[in-house]
């Protein structure tokens, strides 16, 4: 069965969790589809895990279009979200031009990083029938402004700003919200207040969906893994089994556990 935005809204209404994973090619997208992953994110994380950069900033729109098309050819049932890369949505018209390419490549939704300043671009896209995911909290394209990959929303003023931004973005037309590296308590409140499905990564167990970068989930790649990551390949006899284990853990609420969350 093909997953649609309506499917995800129904899951939220029924308080049923859904699993999200990143993919960048047809083969792994197919395996995720077979494992029951509801949503595949074609992430600009490809800049780090595929291209070897130390951030997502060097990723180009043409990179995202290429990998989105590859994923679409492999996944026939999953709902596909494609990241809009750094500096590709500064104005509504610029956002529309990029979204057009990604949607024509096979995306069902595009993702933008930022707060309420995105509202004009989101409203413009929404009026034209483009589904949008708004990414809040730790937004990797702003890593240089943050001074590193740090938990966001720890202070009361930061938390309130994030809640206000989420409401503004949803009112502007955001269909899904994604929270990265935010305290569990804040993510829980935001998820309860939002009508849109909320996906978390490093945001505790109370969001409607969970997302992990595929390479992190499989325990591959150099460097120390973030606190919110779990290696699902360890103890599994295949990549397919690891993907299924992740889906089951998300749906049952077993993942993320307290050890993967920021209880601040």
UniProtKB/Swiss-Prot annotation:
Its cofactor is Mg(2+). Mg(2+) binds at residues 44, 83, 113. Disulfide bonds: none annotated. It catalyses: 3-methyl-2-oxobutanoate + (6R)-5,10-methylene-5,6,7,8-tetrahydrofolate + H2O = 2-dehydropantoate + (6S)-5,6,7,8-tetrahydrofolate. Its EC number is 2.1.2.11. GO terms for biological process: pantothenate biosynthetic process. GO terms for cellular component: cytoplasm. Its main location: cytoplasm. The active site is at residue 180. The keyword Isomerase does not apply. One of its GO terms (molecular function) is 3-methyl-2-oxobutanoate hydroxymethyltransferase activity. 3-methyl-2-oxobutanoate binds at residues 44-45, 83, 111. Pathway: Cofactor biosynthesis; (R)-pantothenate biosynthesis; (R)-pantoate from 3-methyl-2-oxobutanoate: step 1/2. It is found in: Cytoplasm. Keywords: Cytoplasm, Magnesium, Metal-binding, Pantothenate biosynthesis, Transferase. It is an enzyme of class 2 (transferase). Homodecamer; pentamer of dimers. PANTHER family: 3-METHYL-2-OXOBUTANOATE HYDROXYMETHYLTRANSFERASE (PTHR20881:SF0). Catalyzes the reversible reaction in which hydroxymethyl group from 5,10-methylenetetrahydrofolate is transferred onto alpha-ketoisovalerate to form ketopantoate. Belongs to the PanB family. This is 3-methyl-2-oxobutanoate hydroxymethyltransferase 2. It comes from Hahella chejuensis (strain KCTC 2396).
């Amino acid at each position: 069965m093909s997953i649609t935005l309506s499917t995800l809204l129904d899951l939220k209404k029924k308080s049923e969790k859904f699993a999200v994973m990143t993919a960048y090619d047809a083969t792994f997208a197919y395996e995720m589809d077979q494992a029951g992953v509801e949503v595949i994110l074609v992430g600009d994380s490809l800049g780090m895990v595929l291209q070897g950069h130390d951030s997502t900033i060097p990723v180009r729109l043409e990179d995202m279009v290429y990998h989105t098309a590859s994923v679409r050819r492999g996944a026939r049932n999953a709902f596909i979200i494609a990241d809009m890369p750094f500096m590709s949505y500064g104005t509504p018209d610029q956002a529309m031009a990029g979204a057009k390419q990604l949607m024509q490549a096979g995306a069902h939704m595009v993702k933008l990083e930022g707060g309420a300043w995105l509202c004009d671009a989101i409203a413009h896209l929404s009026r034209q029938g483009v589904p949008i995911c708004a990414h809040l909290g730790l937004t990797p394209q702003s890593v240089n402004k943050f001074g590193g990959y740090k938990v966001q929303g720890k202070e009361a003023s930061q938390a309130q700003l994030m809640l206000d931004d989420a409401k503004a973005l949803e009112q502007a037309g955001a269909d899904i919200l994604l929270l990265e590296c935010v305290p569990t308590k804040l993510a829980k409140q935001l998820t309860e207040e939002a009508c849109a499905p909320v996906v978390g990564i490093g945001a505790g167990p109370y969001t409607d969906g969970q997302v992990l970068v595929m390479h992190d989930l499989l325990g591959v790649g150099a460097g120390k893994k973030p606190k919110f990551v779990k290696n699902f390949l360890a103890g599994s006899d295949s990549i397919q089994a690891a993907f299924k284990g992740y889906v089951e853990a998300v749906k049952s609420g077993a993942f993320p556990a307290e050890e993967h969350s920021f209880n601040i």
